[in-house]
Swiss-Prot record:
Origin: domain of life: Bacteria
Binding positions ([2Fe-2S] cluster): 76, 82, 85, 117
Organism of derivation: Chlamydia muridarum (strain MoPn / Nigg)
Cofactor detail note: Binds 1 [2Fe-2S] cluster.
Recorded catalytic activity of this chain's protein: a ubiquinone + n Na(+)(in) + NADH + H(+) = a ubiquinol + n Na(+)(out) + NAD(+)
Record gene name: nqrF
Membrane listed as a keyword: yes
Span of the signal peptide: none
Protein name: Na(+)-translocating NADH-quinone reductase subunit F
Length: 431
């Protein structure tokens, strides 16, 4: 029993330490409740009294405007990564944050330009907002399906009211609003093909509880490119990749949270209701008859599909269209059958699939691991298979979308071949 007696002081100390920690947390929460007082603030917009909004203090300017029915685009979900939620404050401008300093010039900062996702509403302000943002609206969609199309990518299909279609253009995006929620990743198996289970099990991704029940209304939203084209309405489609924590010894780091928006989307089931707002976008098709090359990787498949199907099936274009799509293996490839069918039907459409890490099962099916145009990083395969053979690469349009490394590699490659930045349309949500 002596060894039990020796543990008694340790037990008492540990208990006291935990109790003290809980007490400090309670004090902090109570202090916030009673010391940080919420008060009404007026946001006067474009010097128009009829547009003045009264909001509670404490939230970001981005969230406050969204609560008031003005959806400023923020593709990165308010993380100051995409730098698209720019807004000009003309009265009562606070000191710029570091995120503002890295975004705007000194002159712009003096003029009151700020990132609305980082600016807290603490007092009355006068704002200048582009009129196009007043045309953005919200829609409620119903989940039709939410199946995995790759190990970590889902195709979310929503149906919206056909009497109120969304006026989007190919290359555009919508913001998905995330309510408070709680989910267990094991429940996601309901909308996942069993072929993807093994990778999730290898990285211990199942049976993880993700709890965001404390989310404020409209505090979380993220933009996703549309994979559908207008003729598919009232259905709209997205390709969405799950944002997992970084891995440590083949397990997600428990100290890093899962993506708030992507986890919510992965938890959706047929029949669920989803709120989207928009439409937004700048990466539309340039109507100048130049041939177009799409350089797409991963979940960038949304961006490519929307443009390509609209050009071929709705606009019946005669422009030469080439798609280079990069995936790790055939299991990760998206829309292959659809593109192969289009290639047979339209002589002006050319489809190239490039695998960076083909599986043994891919090789067993006849995939050529020795061909550098089929098995390679996409930017290298594209250079070997097409770019180096073009007499005038600058005469083409290049539409680029994919992971950050994919995008940067393509941009560097095109720059090396003398392609002007104005001929490159990059769909990049701050990745």
């Amino acid at each position: 029993m002596s060894w039990l007696s020796s543990l008694y002081p340790i037990f008492i100390a540990s208990t006291a330490f935990c109790a003290l920690g809980l007490l400090l947390v309670a004090i902090i929460l109570l202090s916030r409740k009673f010391l940080i007082k919420v008060h009404p603030c007026k946001l006067r917009i474009n010097n128009d009294d009829s547009l003045t909004k009264t909001v509670d203090s404490g939230k970001t300017l981005l969230s406050s405007l969204l609560d008031s029915g003005i959806a400023i685009p923020s593709p990165c979900g308010g993380k100051a990564a995409c730098k698209q939620c720019k807004i000009r404050i003309t009265k009562n401008v606070d000191e710029p944050l570091e995120t503002d300093r890295s975004t705007f010039s000194k002159q712009q900062l003096e003029q009151g330009w700020r990132l609305s996702c980082q600016t807290k509403v603490q007092h009355d302000m006068n704002l200048e907002i582009e009129e196009r943002y007043f045309n953005a609206s919200s829609w409620e969609g119903t989940v039709v399906s939410n199946e995995n199309v790759a190990t970590f990518i889902k195709e979310l299909v929503l149906s919206v009211d056909p009497a109120r279609p969304i006026p989007f253009k190919p290359g555009g995006y919508l913001q998905i609003t995330v309510p408070s929620y709680k989910t267990n990743t094991s429940d996601w198996k309901q909308t996942m093909d069993p072929q993807y289970y093994s990778d999730w099990e290898t990285f211990h991704l199942f049976d993880k509880v993700i709890d965001h029940q404390s989310l404020d209304a409209n505090s979380a939203n993220k933009a996703y490119s549309l994979a559908s084209y207008p003729a598919e309405l009232p259905l709209i489609k997205f390709n969405i990749r799950i944002a997992t924590p970084p891995f440590i010894n083949k397990s997600p780091d428990p100290t890093i949270p899962w993506g708030v928006c992507s986890s919510y989307i992965f938890s959706l089931k047929p029949g669920d209701k989803v709120t989207v707002s928009g439409p937004y976008g700048e990466s539309f098709m340039k109507e100048d008859n130049r041939p177009v090359i799409f350089l797409i990787g991963g979940a960038g498949s949304s961006f490519g599909r929307s443009h390509i199907l609209d050009l071929l099936l709705s606009k019946h274009t005669n422009r030469e269209l080439t798609l280079w799509y990069g995936a790790r293996s055939l299991k990760e490839n998206i829309y292959q059958e659809e593109y192969e069918k289009l290639e047979k039907e339209f002589p002006n459409f050319h489809y190239h699939l490039v695998l960076s890490q083909p599986l043994q099962e891919d090789l067993d099916k006849g995939w050529d691991s020795k061909d550098p145009i089929k098995t390679n990083f996409l930017f290298k395969a594209f250079e070997l298979g097409q770019l180096s053979k073009l007499p005038n690469p600058e005469d083409y349009l290049y539409y680029v979308c994919g992971p950050a490394l994919h995008n940067s590699s393509i941009l560097t490659l095109l720059d090396n071949y003398g392609v002007e930045r104005s001929s490159i349309i990059l769909d990049d949500f701050g990745s």
